[in-house]
Amino acid sequence: MAIRVIPCLDVKDGRVVKGVNFVGLRDAGDPVELAAEYGRLGADEVTFLDISASTEGRATTREMVTRCAETVFVPLTVGGGVRGVDDVDVLLRAGADKVGVNTAAIAHPGMIDEVADRFGNQVIVLSVDARREPDRPSGFGVTTHGGTRSAGLDAVEWACQAVERGAGEILLNSMDADGTADGFDIEMIEAVRAAVDVPLIASGGAGKVADFVEAARAGVDAVLAASVFHYHTLTIAQIKDGLRHAGFEVR
């Protein structure tokens, strides 16, 4: 299977936040333009994280997903604030291909079963924000609230439980590595990879092409990044060339 390369965009009230500076785009805050641009540049998928605090903001994001689905021809994952089956239904109807779940699934793990039963495992991406917690059995713990609070769960055990309940994919985000550009947390990836057999996406810490190759060697099926793309540190083509050169299949 080809390794997928996935840019991630944070969306608030229907606009992209965090610096994104594509030259030539009329408005670097428009998620649809950016997603289309990433699609043209070879992205295999695009992930949106909705960080809107308000109901109105979420409604705006839904409209954005609909526009995106009409103009962007790569699979679209939307996460952030998904609280149950109804939210998943709304996003899928709007045009999302997959939906990311995180905090709500920690509070109500049965939600994973409900979504899987209704829509199929393939639509659920469990997002795990993990960091090193030496007292956990695996050495890695689950966090919430942007990494500021411990969820009291072992990251590997939680990933296994979620897969048993029907999660079709795991997005593993290292809160320690996130934003450092020092590379993915390879030990964490290897620990989760050894425990689950669903597709695994690595996130958090990428800074150079070698980081993506290292994650692929650790067994991930996809690599996700934000700032390296937004700030033009790396292009999708450079990452795919690096992976190809290292012997991995890419699309």
From Swiss-Prot:
GO terms for cellular component: cytoplasm. Its EC number is 4.3.2.10. The keyword Plastid does not apply. Pathway: Amino-acid biosynthesis; L-histidine biosynthesis; L-histidine from 5-phospho-alpha-D-ribose 1-diphosphate: step 5/9. Pfam families: His_biosynth (PF00977). InterPro entries: Aldolase_TIM (IPR013785), His_biosynth (IPR006062), HisF (IPR004651), IGPS_HisA/HisF (IPR050064), RibuloseP-bd_barrel (IPR011060). SUPFAM superfamilies: Ribulose-phoshate binding barrel. Its main location: cytoplasm. The keyword Transmembrane does not apply. GO terms for biological process: L-histidine biosynthetic process. It is an enzyme of class 4 (lyase). It catalyses: 5-[(5-phospho-1-deoxy-D-ribulos-1-ylimino)methylamino]-1-(5-phospho-beta-D-ribosyl)imidazole-4-carboxamide + L-glutamine = D-erythro-1-(imidazol-4-yl)glycerol 3-phosphate + 5-amino-1-(5-phospho-beta-D-ribosyl)imidazole-4-carboxamide + L-glutamate + H(+). It is found in: Cytoplasm. The active site is at D10, D129. GO terms for molecular function: imidazoleglycerol-phosphate synthase activity; lyase activity. Heterodimer of HisH and HisF. Belongs to the HisA/HisF family. IGPS catalyzes the conversion of PRFAR and glutamine to IGP, AICAR and glutamate. The HisF subunit catalyzes the cyclization activity that produces IGP and AICAR from PRFAR using the ammonia provided by the HisH subunit. This is Imidazole glycerol phosphate synthase subunit HisF. The gene is hisF.
